[in-house]
């Protein structure tokens, strides 16, 4: 096994709330400077910048993970991670059919830029990505897993779109992993919700600016002699709740 410092929740300039400097190449470069080994790109309800992100990360020696931050019909944010680009693209096609056809207003919400790995703009998503998709939390998780991925509630320690803030509880009969935005909140949430003690905990940044990307603090111990194998190991740990790191 090898140790990989990670950040599994990063937004690019495709997310309207993401800074325009959050290009795939800039994210990969900053993650490399910080010493991260695995980084997931998780834009709101879209994975269209993941191909450019893969190319940029591979140049920097980082293992990229294709992902999405899905907004469910309950208005809960769900991190969805995939073993490869094709799985993420298929999942996105399913989600795109469930997104409301509301046009983005860049002057209000921000631009939604689709990039190549050289920081070139190749397009712009016209429909607003922030709105909830017509898919429930449970169905979103199941759909993600049907494409070989893993899904878990994002930033449960935040008021905005966190599962606890929205639903009033962390469902006790589920086998979700869960994400914290602040590692120092772990004890508080374990005390409030004892049933999460045996679930896989993930600490990630939800970065919308380059300086928000995680420092090399949280890590997984993962198997694999290739990027594909390491991604499969990561998803297996998340799905099965293994205590993979800290």
Predicted features along the sequence, with ranges:
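Active-site gating loops and adjacent loop-to-helix segments of metal-dependent hydrolytic enzymes
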Residues: 83-125, 168
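Alpha-helix-centered segments that form part of catalytic cores
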Residues: 111-147
């Amino acid at each position: 096994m090898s140790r990989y410092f990670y950040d599994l929740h990063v937004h690019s300039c495709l997310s309207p709330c993401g800074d325009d400097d959050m290009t795939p190449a800039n994210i990969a470069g900053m993650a490399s400077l910080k010493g991260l080994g695995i980084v997931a790109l998780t834009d709101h309800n879209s994975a269209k910048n993941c191909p450019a992100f893969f190319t940029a990360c591979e140049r920097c020696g980082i293992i990229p993970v294709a992902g999405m931050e899905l907004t469910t019909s309950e208005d809960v944010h769900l991190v969805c991670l995939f073993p490869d680009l094709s799985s993420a693209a298929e999942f996105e096609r399913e989600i795109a059919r469930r997104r409301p056809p509301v046009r983005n207003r860049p002057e209000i919400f921000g631009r939604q830029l689709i990039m190549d790995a050289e920081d070139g703009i190749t397009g712009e998503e016209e429909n607003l990505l922030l709105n909830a998709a017509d898919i429930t939390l449970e169905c979103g998780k199941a759909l993600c897993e049907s494409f070989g991925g893993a899904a878990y509630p994002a930033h449960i320690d935040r008021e905005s779109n966190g599962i606890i803030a929205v639903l009033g509880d962390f469902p006790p009969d589920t086998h979700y992993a869960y994400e914290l935005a602040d590692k120092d909140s772990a004890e508080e949430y374990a005390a409030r919700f004892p049933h999460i003690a045996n679930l896989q905990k993930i600490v990630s940044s939800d970065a919308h600016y380059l300086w928000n990307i995680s420092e090399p603090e949280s890590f997984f111990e993962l198997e694999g002699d290739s990027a594909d194998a390491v991604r499969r190991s990561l998803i297996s740990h998340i799905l099965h709740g293994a205590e993979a790191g800290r």
